[in-house]
Amino acid sequence: KYIIVQTHTNKDEISREISRVLIEKKLVACVNVYPAASSIFRYNNTIVEENEYLLQAKTTSDKFLDIKTVIEQLHNYETPEIISIAILDGNADYLTWINNEIN
């Protein structure tokens, strides 16, 4: 039921815009933005190393498709990472807070 939705971008302004829109639309309770993620990946048959912003948003699984749509609309990558990670357990008060923020 509770999930973390994760994505990366190489632009600070994109990370902030995605975060703000998701919170404004009450799709997520909060977004943690980590500015120093070092990523190594293949793009157009070339190995690329890039500093990226990691975004982790706390929410519930019923919001995932709407979150995915927002990220796809605002993201600067051709194929952005948009994944869901299950929260198997947690502080009950924190999980209640997530519910209160998105409902």
Whereabouts are the PLM-identified features?
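Positively charged, small/polar-rich N-terminal and surface patches that mediate targeting and assembly
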Residues: 1-103
